C-alpha cells in the first residue's frame, strides 16, 4: 500500500504559511486549526495514562469491537506506553524474524480510546506533545526480512533471485540520537508510525493504511505536529502504536528504527468538520495523506484532498487551487 503526503506550501497560501514562520511552538499551536475549531480550544482539562499493565491486551486491528481502554473528554492529555512493531519479541541480533514473528500479528496498538461527543462526520485532532524511548537498552530494532521491502520480490511478486538474508540490528536509542555505530549517530526524530480511528463497521489489520489512518508510516506524524483523523463511529475509537526513532521517506526496506516509547498526546474534537482522509498540520505546512494502490492513486487522493481543502476552508476557486 503506497502512501503519499502532499503539502500546501506554495504561492497561493504562502502569505498564510509565512504568518506561522519564526514563532514559537506554543504560538503557532494557538493559531492551529485544532485550537481555533476544537471543542477544548487547545486547553488541557485532564491527564491520563495508558501503561503496559493498564493496556493489557494490545490490538492488531483497528475497529469498534474492542472495549475502550480509556474514555476521555476533548482536551485530555494522555501518556501512552507503546510497544515496538514486534511487541518486543526481537531481543538480540541472532534472532530470526521468520522464526519469531507471527504475521499478521505485528504493529501492536494501544487503545482504543473513546472520546466523548465524537460522532460520525466530526474530526479528531491529536497533538503529539512528546515522545521518549523507554525500556532497557538497546531498545531500537531494525531488520531485513526475506521477501519484504521496496526493492525485493515478495511472495505475491516472486522473482528468480534468492530472497535477501535475514539480518537484525539492535541499537541504542536515546534522546541524543540513534547510535548506529561508533562512527555514526543518527538524529532522534521520533514519530507515530500507526495511528487511526476505527472504521465504521470493519475491523482492519494494523498493517494497513487507509482513509481512517492506520499504518501510514509518515515521518510528519511527529512531535509538535497535529494529525487530524476522520471520525467514523461514535467515540472515534483512537488507536496508536508502532513508533519509529528514525526513518527516511518511504520506509524502503520495510522496517524503520522501531522502538517502544512513552508518547504524550492531547486530543481534541472538531464538530461537523468532515474530512475524507488524514491531514497533518505543522508549524510550516498543511498536509494531506493519501493511501492506495497503485501509488498513483495515493498521489491523486492526497492532492485531490488539498484542492478541496483549499476550496472549502480558504475560499479558493477549485481550478485556481488545482493550478
Q: What does each model-identified segment do?
A:
Residues 53-63, 103-109, 204-212:
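Short, structured beta-strand/loop micro-motifs enriched in basic residues and often containing a Trp
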Residues 72, 115-118, 221:
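Short, well-ordered loop/turn sites that connect or cap secondary structure elements
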Residues 85-95, 131-142, 235-245:
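Short, Lys/Arg- and Gly-enriched loop/turn segments at beta-strand edges
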Residues 130-223:
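Intrinsically disordered, low-complexity linker/loop segments enriched in Gly/Pro
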Residues 192, 198-215, 219-220, 225-296:
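Conserved mixed alpha/beta catalytic, RNA-binding, or beta-rich assembly cores of soluble enzyme
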